[in-house]
């Protein structure tokens, strides 16, 4: 069986491609728009399609013969001024249309854990979360087998959040630093994507988080290997309002949702060690 991954050059995408190849998936097709990312993915063993995620004909052609298609576009880290609908919902609409045209059986998407928290009181007010909630609705209504992976903050090599928290003190912290988080290792998210491809007759929303719940202030200290000075701000430098709002809120597992069967979450200490953050201090 073949599996296709859009957003394959991103934090989760690259880890997912590597995890799927380790699982001996027959063909892993990685979709990227940046020519500079092609060589690295090919070295991993993936077949690479260079096209824009909003190109319906190109995506449908790339999906030919694919059983599972995984959409990893539309992350929180969009460019300043970018419309969340254009960055998140439109690529998902094109992705689902292409999947239907190509006869794809199953789709997998990642969504922020905060989508579930915000949805408890109606549609999310945060534009990024609202866009992700709309994508979840589209996936559920598509008639395709699917897995929606609601992830807490994802940490891994090259994580934008990790770079923010690892900045030279005093560290700019969105919010008051007391918000509770349970960061998940990017390798665990990749393993969940691989599990979703390998599960029979799937239609599920899974909750992905790390096993350790800490305050953001404690996470900053853990990243630095000890207590450091912090500035608590409504919006840290370089963040959009939507990004700062998400980071200033809790990011925890949804107790009403199951963790992917058979997977064991990675402890926070192991996650930070694997990112090499402490080695860079």
Predicted segments with their positions:
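NAD(P)H-binding glycine-rich loop region in Rossmannoid oxidoreductase-like domains
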Residues: 33-94, 98, 115-120
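Oxidoreductase cofactor-interface core, primarily capturing Rossmann-like NAD(P)-dependent enzymes
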Residues: 23, 117-223
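A short helix->loop->beta-strand "cap" motif at the edges of active sites that frequently abuts
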Residues: 25, 101-106, 144
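Short alpha-helix in the Rossmann-fold core of NAD(P)-dependent oxidoreductases
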Residues: 84-92, 108, 132, 182
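SDR active-site strand-loop-helix element
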Residues: 6, 31, 72-73, 107-113, ...
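Mid/C-terminal beta-alpha module of Rossmann-like enzyme folds, strongest
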Residues: 15, 192-243, 253-281
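Conserved glycine-rich Rossmann-like NAD(P)H-binding loop of the short-chain dehydrogenase/reductase
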Residues: 25-34
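N-terminal Rossmann NAD(P)H-binding glycine-rich loop of SDR-like oxidoreductase domains
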Residues: 2-26
């Amino acid at each position: 069986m073949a599996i296709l991954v859009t957003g394959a050059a991103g934090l989760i995408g690259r880890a997912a491609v590597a995890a799927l190849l380790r699982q001996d998936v027959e063909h892993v097709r990685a979709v990227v728009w940046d020519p500079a990312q092609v060589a690295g993915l090919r070295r991993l063993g993936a077949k690479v399609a260079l096209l824009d995620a909003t190109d319906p004909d190109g995506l449908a052609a790339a999906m030919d013969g694919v059983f599972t298609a995984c959409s990893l576009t539309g992350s929180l880290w969009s460019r300043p001024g970018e419309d969340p609908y254009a960055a998140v919902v439109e690529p998902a609409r094109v992705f689902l249309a292409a999947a239907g045209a190509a006869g794809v059986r199953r789709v997998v998407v990642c969504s922020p854990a905060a989508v579930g928290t915000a949805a408890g009181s109606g549609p999310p007010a945060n534009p990024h979360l609202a866009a992700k909630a709309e994508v979840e609705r589209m996936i559920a209504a598509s008639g395709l087998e699917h897995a929606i992976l609601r992830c807490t903050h994802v940490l891994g090599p090259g994580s934008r959040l990790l770079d923010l928290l690892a900045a030279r003190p005093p560290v700019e912290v969105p919010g008051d630093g007391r918000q509770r988080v349970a960061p998940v290792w990017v390798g665990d998210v990749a393993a969940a994507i691989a599990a979703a491809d390998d599960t029979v007759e799937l239609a599920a929303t899974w909750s992905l988080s790390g096993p350790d719940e800490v305050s953001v202030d404690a996470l900053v200290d853990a990243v630095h290997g000890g207590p450091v000075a912090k500035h608590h701000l409504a919006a840290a430098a370089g963040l959009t309002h939507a990004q700062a709002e998400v980071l200033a809120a809790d990011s925890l597992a949804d107790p009403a949702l199951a963790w992917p069967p058979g997977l064991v979450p990675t402890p926070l200490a192991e996650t930070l060690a694997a990112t090499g953050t402490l080695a860079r201090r």
